Amino acid sequence: MGSSAEFRIQIRCSSNMRQRRTNTTLLSIPIELIVDILLRLPVESLIRCRCVCKSLRSLIFDRRFVMTHLNNIVTGINMNTNSFRLLVSHNDSLLLMYCEGSKDGDGSHLAIKEVDHPAVMDTDVCLCILGSCNGLVCLEIGDDNSIIILWNPCTRDTKVLPQPPYHFQDKMFHGFGYDSLTEDYKIMLATEGPSEVMMNVFSLKRNSWRTYEYLADLRTTDQQGCFLNGALHWITFEGVTSARNCLYVYNDPTEDTDFCIWIMKEYGVKESWTRVIKISSEILAQQVFVEVDKLELKVVCILENGEVLMDHEGKVLVSYNPKTRTFRNIIKGKEDDEFQATTYLETLVSPVTAAEGGGGANNM
């Protein structure tokens, strides 16, 4: 993207001493070099750059730039940014978690901060996370008269979607992803009909829902689908998640069965399944303080430092360090508390302009 033409940035400089302003051309740089520099920056820095001048704002808002920046993050080309984030809905709060370097230089630790709710919602309403893809998070807000929104937590862009043609209480499982064939973001909500499963599919391009009847008896162990490699994944036993562009599956532990996490190193190749984590039932019994047979562990994600984040019944969020073989509590709510979590990438993708097509990648 870009041309050989020069990109001139006019910046007005001020002097407090002389109370005067002058216009000065500070830069006269080929646009290819400017674009290359900007593509290496994290989203937070790019948002600040958009305020410098109209020229930079226009460039950073350009759909081709947004797509290239996204693809660089997903494919790992942009190694200078740590764009991986975990969004947690806990009671009335939204928490953002991410890995950052420790001050003593000894690896990294999990940082936690509270983030503002989307502007279209109150702070005391029920919130359900339906999934995330390419930096967009799909949220269901409210109880009886729920609405569904697409939200970029980093840029704060929000789009309220049309009401789906189903009753929220009938929802069986759901997913959110990007269809690269049609360059369209889609939401899939499966609901239980009188004698069949109803597949309700929302197209962001069309801004409308379509309903399909599916006669097979579909049952999954987890409501939220896992989006990877252009497809949504569910599993009919134990659990499934994704991290670092790979599928992970795990089993329910028992007193006689260890808790194991397996990774599919090469997508679609069953021989590539490799066990990466094994937690003995003895360690679980000693450190989690719940009878192993009553544990309902769900792998949320695997962090860059190798720690595994897991939740138990949406009540406790714990971190397991495979090096020290120890657990620590991240969130431990009261008996009536419940939380949800989803991973996402910090990107410039807007739910508003994404409806025009493009701006997608197949993996996250």
Regions found by a protein language model. Name each.
Residues 1-364:
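Short, conserved recognition motifs on repeat-domain binding surfaces
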